[in-house]
Amino acid sequence: MAELPQSRINERNITSEMRESFLDYAMSVIVARALPDVRDGLKPVHRRILYGLNEQGMTPDKSYKKSARIVGDVMGKYHPHGDSSIYEAMVRMAQDFSYRYPLVDGQGNFGSMDGDGAAAMRYTEARMTKITLELLRDINKDTIDFIDNYDGNEREPSVLPARFPNLLANGASGIAVGMATNIPPHNLTELINGVLSLSKNPDISIAELMEDIEGPDFPTAGLILGKSGIRRAYETGRGSIQMRSRAVIEERGGGRQRIVVTEIPFQVNKARMIEKIAELVRDKKIDGITDLRDETSLRTGVRVVIDVRKDANASVILNNLYKQTPLQTSFGVNMIALVNGRPKLINLKEALVHYLEHQKTVVRRRTQYNLRKAKDRAHILEGLRIALDHIDEIISTIRESDTDKVAMESLQQRFKLSEKQAQAILDMRLRRLTGLERDKIEAEYNELLNYISELETILADEEVLLQLVRDELTEIRDRFGDDRRTEIQLGGFEDLEDEDLIPEEQIVITLSHNNYIKRLPVSTYRAQNRGGRGVQGMNTLEEDFVSQLVTLSTHDHVLFFTNKGRVYKLKGYEVPELSRQSKGIPVVNAIELENDEVISTMIAVKDLESEDNFLVFATKRGVVKRSALSNFSRINRNGKIAISFREDDELIAVRLTSGQEDILIGTSHASLIRFPESTLRPLGRTATGVKGITLREGDEVVGLDVAHANSVDEVLVVTENGYGKRTPVNDYRLSNRGGKGIKTATITERNGNVVCITTVTGEEDLMIVTNAGVIIRLDVADISQNGRAAQGVRLIRLGDDQFVSTVAKVKEDAEDETNEDEQSTSTVSEDGTEQQREAVVNDETPGNAIHTEVIDSEENDEDGRIEVRQDFMDRVEEDIQQSSDEDEE
């Protein structure tokens, strides 16, 4: 291999060479490829395409020309970077779903919202749109600078006159080296109104500009959620705008619904969006969708139909789709454009200021051009006027001249004419010597003088020039302006909360002794008569049992108060929904409990900010405290201190009050004290309370509740052996806080110690939970009303080693009650046939007849009997559901 001459080798440091070469490449990409000019909103490739269309005369009133011809001409003259990049840029300018105001009028297949590519350039045709003419108007009147093309054989515009603000009207996107731009499209009417306001008030604020320019206006319409993202983008040049599809929920007969999507967010691929929905349905991440189809057509426009199952909540499904699919997405605004050839981040006002300055420059240069042309013409007309005034001498001079050159010199010398004037006289036809032509020349001359005066006035007075810019912008607005397509919805839509995705329904949250938690729909538990065996509420682990239960809405807050005096918070829907037989999940997976900490009370609250509500605390040692509910509105995931007390004490219960209640505190030895809540001074969140009741030896607090001063409520007492009774609240006199209380029940071996003391109205249902995990739901009104000293009546039949662990009130809901005969039950015999057994009456219990369901079986123990009944009830429910589905079909 021959060695290169030494003179052709330049030694350079590789670091310097890489730095300089990369910078040259980066600047080339930034300036000459990826970023739009702030003045006309175009990248070089788009500018060259439009100029090429103009040079080829492909105006809207001319016929379409092959795209291949356009691309070839642009590539050969101005853009030597490959035909595909030119054609792709032209295709995008022709897509009405990509450009708010398309700049190319395409004929043929130019792609679709489903991501389909355009047909090959040999098949499609194109020409300019009408609005494109406004980008190029006056380009031949010295309004902009021209530069050499890549090989120096052609001239191309450095920028277009851009008689409307194209940068913001159609937006722009591009990725350069180390930077990127993403500018949303806007409504032309609003933009021009904004420019007009800016021209009248240069000190206008962004907020004032937003009175004219509401926000982006996307070609695919859709919705924008809130204005905070828009305002941030307009003020800083950067921001995120939440876009959402337009969807409606329609009825489709038979109680069924469908979701119909008619507009989708800008730049969303419709086909991929539908695929994403189908994928979520297939993976069971979204439930309740039975059918999904695309009914989009030229006649109907975008129409995506999502059929919803009859028992599903269409609104919740739609919110899930918003959160998990491109039905809702964001547009990241990054307004970077070339300003004086340099990339710069600009805000809304800066973009309009630069555009307005460009228009003033265009109009000024056009005026100067027109003035030059007018003066040149006036100069010629002055020569013609001289010739007409001396026509005989002019003719004589010309006839005496041997050549054109001699004639021109003679005319210049004899009549003091310029070369152009002399040439115009020589070029003048004889017919212009008539009197009529003389009048025309005189009229044209006078008209030109007036025109020159107007042009000079424009150039001399900046305000006159600015008014001319306003008038021309107004004319464009009136011709091409339209109504905005994208609707801006005001409100707290920027962040879709989890709560929006969850249907609001009544639920039951259970907590086991070993701290396993779950939630179930409240309808899981059917109302039964007293003495029933109940249904299996959960399958507990060995030595575990349900200890607490609370009813609330999925959207309510749940406050968890622990024996250590701490408080934690969850939303109802944040507790996992599991099956009735499931044991639940460890509560430490939901809230961050400390060591040796267990939940003592769960309270459902709708509004934690309420200033009218209080929380009353009671500890095992008889200490009480009252604190404002608002003190607990902000609780971290790791909890906060709710009450302070001695090491040998622990929190027993907490109640929500209105501030005007009577406080009831009950003990395991059946003592109860009642005193006004007003005697408790509100204390801070971490404060220690005061003495609420004086306890006897071996006694401890087991219950805390509230009642109104003249309440007709009753005190419900339930003992550990399943007995209970109701006693009017007014049977318990008011006393001073800190007393020993009065007797509320007679405690014997038969009924056991008190496990629950609470107030009832008689209109609730009662849920009684045993240590075996059995739950029974019964009507409080069915419980006998007895005096304070009574033992109570049997509420639930307990097996050996069973006891009542907790009791909870449930709002009565007729829809949850079954229509089955509660006085009989069915069992399954060995041959599979159902046998009907009569209920027996428990004569041990006084009062009204108590219907008790008893299943005798030699092969099953008590747990087995419960399982047999549960299996049968599950199959009955399945049969009922199947019959209902068949009827619907």
UniProtKB/Swiss-Prot annotation:
Alphabetical UniProt keywords: Antibiotic resistance, ATP-binding, Cytoplasm, DNA-binding, Isomerase, Nucleotide-binding, Topoisomerase
Q: Locate the compositionally biased regions of type Acidic residues.
A: 813-823, 876-889
The UniProt entry's GO CC annotations, sorted and at most eight, read:
chromosome; cytoplasm; DNA topoisomerase type II (double strand cut, ATP-hydrolyzing) complex
Active site per the UniProt annotation: 123
Give the organism, scientific name: Staphylococcus aureus (strain N315)
UniProt function note: A type II topoisomerase that negatively supercoils closed circular double-stranded (ds) DNA in an ATP-dependent manner to modulate DNA topology and maintain chromosomes in an underwound state. Negative supercoiling favors strand separation, and DNA replication, transcription, recombination and repair, all of which involve strand separation. Also able to catalyze the interconversion of other topological isomers of dsDNA rings, including catenanes and knotted rings. Type II topoisomerases break and join 2 DNA strands simultaneously in an ATP-dependent manner.
Highest taxon, organism lineage = Bacteria
Subcellular location, record wording: Cytoplasm
Question: What else is on record for this protein?
Answer: Few gyrases are as efficient as E.coli at forming negative supercoils. Not all organisms have 2 type II topoisomerases; in organisms with a single type II topoisomerase this enzyme also has to decatenate newly replicated chromosomes.
Q: Which GO terms describe its biological process?
A: DNA topological change; DNA-templated DNA replication; response to antibiotic
Q: What gene is behind this protein?
A: gyrA
Q: Which family does it belong to?
A: Belongs to the type II topoisomerase GyrA/ParC subunit family.
Where would I find the Topo IIA-type catalytic domain in this sequence?
35-501
Q: Which reaction does it catalyse?
A: ATP-dependent breakage, passage and rejoining of double-stranded DNA
Q: Name one Pfam family in it.
A: DNA_gyraseA_C
Question: Which portions of the sequence form the region Disordered?
Answer: 810-889
A molecular function annotated in GO for this UniProt entry is: ATP binding
Read off the InterPro entries from this record.
GyrA, GyrA/parC_rep, Gyrase/topoIV_suA_C, Topo_IIA-like_dom_sf, Topo_IIA_A/C_ab, Topo_IIA_A_a_sf, Topo_IIA_dom_A, Type_II_DNA_Topoisomerases
Q: Where is the composition biased (Basic and acidic residues)?
A: 863-875
Q: What Enzyme Commission number(s) appear in the record? A: 5.6.2.2
The record's annotation in CDD domains points to: TOP4c
What is annotated about its quaternary structure and interactions? Heterotetramer, composed of two GyrA and two GyrB chains. In the heterotetramer, GyrA contains the active site tyrosine that forms a transient covalent intermediate with DNA, while GyrB binds cofactors and catalyzes ATP hydrolysis.
Looking up HAMAP family in the UniProt record yields: GyrA (MF_01897)
The entry's protein name is DNA gyrase subunit A
| SUPFAM superfamilies tied to this protein | GyrA/ParC C-terminal domain-like, Type II DNA topoisomerase
| Keyword Disulfide bond recorded | no
- Residue numbers of motif GyrA-box? 528-534
NCBIfam families cross-referenced by the UniProt entry: gyrA, PRK05560.1, PRK05561.1
